[in-house]
Amino acid sequence: MILTPLVAIYWLWAVWAITWTLAGAWAARPAKRMPRREERPHLIVTFTGIALLFFFRGGPVLWTPSAGAGWALAGLATLSFAFCWWARLTMGRLWAPLVSRTAEHRLVATGPFAVVRHPIYAGLCGAVIAVALAQGLATSLVGAALAIVGFTMKGALEERFLRQELGAEAYDAYARRTPMLIPFWPR
């Protein structure tokens, strides 16, 4: 098999998904969780986007990136996943796959959380953009857009939950000085 930029991006996604899932065993048990019905909308939007990116490869090819552009997109995916992992390691056992709070939960505002409030979602946005641009398909662009909307929805849900659980004053001060997903974006 020849390693093309797109194949490299698929491998990066596979390695990230496997290691991310395995690392879930490291997370602390939640003391309180958001009701699942409140999470359902962002899950539907996000997983529809991911399905369009990886499982529905039909539709017109809008472009085929050059080898250099393809490898630059593979680099973007690599950096994006590294940003996700930096955030996950910074959170430690506070991380959870669903919107929840652990008994020892606190506001994390260091490392990548000093750059954006949701560095995992920011990294995933970069990774879905990389795969969509490398595929060059209309369905991929729609999938990436839906996934990004889903990540943004989950970020907003987490913020509402954390304001309630950790106190609005501290979280609002953090939100005033740190953009949600895009580094250096005006607040």
Predicted regions and their residues:
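Membrane-anchoring alpha-helices and their flanking helix-loop junctions
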Residues: M1-A109, A127-R187
